């Protein structure tokens, strides 16, 4: 097994360490392909792995410039998967080279902080300025949008403090120990330069950025950013912040969610009702309340996003599920010991219980027993992990809560799929509670159809050609964050389903495909 870790330049050590270590832990050899500006850091990192005892044939360095040779590496038939930290455009480029690439990505972010009238203005300004301009705005988690709600958008105090705080930051090279804003690493990046120099319609500078040479820019703040504008929707790796004004928190949430990305997001408020509304409605992977939105810490704040900020079957880096994306689930051999949870008798959700009852007469005794063990294990995992908000750090000064959110899922059961497998996957989907669509090659039993219709699950009977046409439409029409679970005959290799699905979806990075065994 071979994994290519394609790491960025903005975290030249921490991110590749995480990717390489995770791939090794999952049992894969690793080729580290760093971004060109970070090649020297990557060389030292690989040497450290070797000095620690990792064999040289398990961790290799490919210090390549971007171009044909890099393309040859990531598309090589011997590479089983690519772990990318970079832009969404890079993920799309990789998939255009090889549509069936197993690509796991943490990609772009267009991140915002919302400030409501109830916020502490001093604390809010401090966190906005740090989140926008530290590292010269070159963290994928950096905030390039400030959304002011109601009277906060008319506050002379907030406006004055924001401009004063940003203007007072010390700009300088890395050799200056007092530098607070360093150089733009790729100074000729067209998008970054545009963000620092070109205003959109109705926008104006309240703090105009200045170029000092050697890649150094003073911070810039533009006001008058409107929904749907380029600055509202585009990620800029540069020290520039755009200010938007809305009347209500509901409008602010809508404005933030209009962006195709969902990496980090922040809220400054002292109102618990506002906090509850925001937590329920905002679409981002890492949420920060009355804090800056950068600087996630492994385990305490595992890192990863929604929509176009996450590619493939990846989960949060530094979190408890990260290794799951680096392997494939396989059915346990017959007679293997079942997990302890499978022997417990947790309370089943009513919909799950109804599903089991609906297929009881269509399954063999062995299949029914296996389904019951599976849903019991699901229920136990739901109670302890997936359905519970957990703070594993237990810090006295702050709460770090890990929660799971249901996302839309499209299930396809092709010709020859066992009903037991369909029931098992549907049981998990009904428990999670997210929107489910089902495509089947053969009609499902009437009792099962009744349960699904009562649960609001749309079921379509379609042949392979109709299904592939549907998958192509879903994959290329903005179905951001969609999960597609594809089942087939148990004797069929998951790689065959993967190949068919990636061809049908044209390698779109906007959907995550799951084709493994049940």
Model-derived features with residue positions:
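Extended low-complexity, polyampholyte segments enriched in Ser/Thr/Pro and acidic residues
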Residues: 138-141
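Conserved C-terminal structural/oligomerization subdomain of aldehyde/semialdehyde dehydrogenase
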Residues: 4, 10, 53-56, 71, ...
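Short gly/Ser/Thr-rich phosphate-binding loop of adenylate-forming enzymes
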Residues: 84-96
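A short hydrophobic/small-residue beta-strand
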Residues: 24, 29-31, 436
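Extended, low-polarity segments enriched in aliphatic/aromatic residues
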Residues: 39-52, 447-451
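A short helix->loop->beta-strand "cap" motif at the edges of active sites that frequently abuts
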Residues: 28, 98-102, 434, 504
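Conserved short alpha-helical elements in the N-terminal third of ANL/AMP-binding
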Residues: 19-26, 427-431
